[in-house]
Curated annotation (Swiss-Prot):
One of its GO terms (molecular function) is glucosamine-6-phosphate deaminase activity. The active site is at D62 (proton acceptor), N128 (for ring-opening step), H130 (proton acceptor), E135 (for ring-opening step). Belongs to the glucosamine/galactosamine-6-phosphate isomerase family. NagB subfamily. The lineage of its organism: Bacteria, Bacillati, Bacillota, Bacilli, Lactobacillales. Catalyzes the reversible isomerization-deamination of glucosamine 6-phosphate (GlcN6P) to form fructose 6-phosphate (Fru6P) and ammonium ion. One of its GO terms (biological process) is N-acetylglucosamine catabolic process. Keywords: Carbohydrate metabolism, Hydrolase. GO terms for cellular component: cytoplasm. The gene is nagB. This is Glucosamine-6-phosphate deaminase.
Amino acid sequence: MKIIRVQDQLEGGKVAFSLLKESLAEGATTLGLATGSTPITFYQELVNSDLDCSALTSINLDEYVGLPVENDQSYDYFMRDQLFNAKPFKESFLPNGLADDLEAEVKRYDQVIAEHPIDFQILGIGRNGHIGFNEPGTSFAEKTHVVDLQASTIEANSRFFASIDDVPKQAISMGIASIMASKMIVLLAFGKEKAAAIKGMVSGPVTEALPASVLQQHDNVVVIIDEAAASELD
């Protein structure tokens, strides 16, 4: 696990984008993408670059259950707004949170991942150590699955909604085993509220109680953090 300390989120996005360019030069064609506030500066770098994404495939980590794609809090909307409208990809996959049969959708998404192995995966990390929507206690062997979101995650995401009652209670998430199958993983974290999770991820025991700790077992992980997120590291 390589750790790169940066001044702020802006620099973090630039560093992540430079790593992406290196991966693309080495033949990467499939990107695993994340949502939320953490990767926004990475997407801004991508949008403002001259990079042509028309031959690339993207696979998103997760999507809320029950939100229409036109809802501005759906991850489908987020990805179009932050990236795809400006930089169309050859193919862009997200879980369908409106599927009538969620278990069938889970199987479909596992098939998508199997057919498009991820070369470069962007991750954030939750305060409780979640990656994707893989909450504490999720099996490291889990593939795509329907998640009941923990209260801490619902509370953290409520800032994006009019009321905490509007936050979806479930999501479809790529599993930890799916994430670990990526060739390269770049995890971004900024702010003091992520410091405890970063410490556990980097130097704590590998435990399903802190999902991100499994990244210690991956042979190509780069962690990009600001000083606040790094503040509990030795």
